[in-house]
């Protein structure tokens, strides 16, 4: 049973890396930290329906968030998105 658990853990880690790594490659970094406003929109892993906002590189755009997962480029309001991502 121990081998099966180990293989399951390795498989889960592999899937998480395959999902996360491309998003990190597309992100911009400032002072060694990911700039969340440069991440792509990500609706997450669930099928719920929440209207959220993300920064598309130019402006804040509405999208549907599933309720779990995703990345930091997700804001509850357009105002919150603009405040965080739009440079004055």
Swiss-Prot record:
Recorded protein name is: Kunitz-type U15-theraphotoxin-Hs1d
The organism's superkingdom is given as Eukaryota
**GO process terms (BP):** envenomation resulting in negative regulation of voltage-gated potassium channel activity in another organism
One cellular component term from this protein's GO annotations in UniProt: extracellular space
Q: Which part of the chain is the BPTI/Kunitz inhibitor domain?
A: 37-85
The protein's organism comes out as Cyriopagopus schmidti (Chinese bird spider)
Q: Which UniProt keywords apply?
A: Disulfide bond, Protease inhibitor, Secreted, Serine protease inhibitor, Signal
InterPro entries in UniProt: Kunitz_BPTI, Kunitz_BPTI_sf, TFPI/VKTCI-like
Q: Which residues does the annotation list for site: Reactive bond for chymotrypsin?
A: 47-48
Which cysteines are disulphide-bonded?
37-85, 60-81
